[in-house]
């Protein structure tokens, strides 16, 4: 009988979006417990070794982290299996680089470089609002932050902008039709579009209809929607492709056009 937490993760069972080869080993890094779920995070080691190619082995990643070069959301992290997740800002002081973890249209975390100015804040989705001891209102975000005394106008599913230096809310975006959003779960993961309407289903999941910049419409659960800007202007920079998913035929035509122009 197994007692206690699981400490290993087989490569075959690792999330697909980490893009680890099946045959290069038996095990994958098991993310530590942290603000993001195992299936929805990217361990620091995978980001530094497999994405940025700054290290060849896990030992090298450890040496980089132990020199306190890597910051996530403005805090130094030395744990190589720390689970970084959606909207987290990863800063590497030594190279002066800043990255934000956002999904591409294939549902993988894109290596998305951002400016120093943009690295000072992040957006968080409001998961729940509760009243704590002595009637103090609390707000809980998607990355497990608890913020006391929020603006009473902020409701669940809204998005708050957090200053990473102070951890305080600087602004917020209402969940409303006409606002631009990103899909953070389900089959449409990584797509960006404008909320067109919300179907309410009491006792079940509300369904949200979204229209992307090419005019394609799709629907998903409200829990998969993350509002990223007012109107159709996002508050963060988007990775290449701007969250517009192409059909297989469109991708092929784009590839052929690129080939002809370079050839």
Swiss-Prot record:
One cellular component term from this protein's GO annotations in UniProt: cytosolic small ribosomal subunit
Pfam families: 40S_S4_C, KOW, Ribosomal_S4e, RS4NT
InterPro entries linked to this entry: KOW, Rib_uL2_dom2, Ribosomal_eS4, Ribosomal_eS4_C, Ribosomal_eS4_central_region, Ribosomal_eS4_central_sf, Ribosomal_eS4_KOW, Ribosomal_eS4_N
Sequence ranges assigned to domain S4 RNA-binding in this UniProt record: 42-104
Transmembrane segments: none
Keywords of this entry: Ribonucleoprotein, Ribosomal protein, RNA-binding, rRNA-binding
Highest rank taxon of the organism: Eukaryota
Biological process, per Gene Ontology: translation
GO molecular function: RNA binding; rRNA binding; structural constituent of ribosome
UniProt-listed Gene3D superfamilies: 2.30.30.30, 2.40.50.740, RNA-binding S4 domain
The keyword RNA-binding belongs to this UniProt entry's keyword annotation: yes
PANTHER family linked: 30S/40S RIBOSOMAL PROTEIN S4, SMALL RIBOSOMAL SUBUNIT PROTEIN ES4, Y ISOFORM 2
Family: Belongs to the eukaryotic ribosomal protein eS4 family.
The name this protein goes by in its record: Small ribosomal subunit protein eS4, Y isoform 2
Natural source organism: Pan troglodytes
Gene symbol of the encoding locus: RPS4Y2
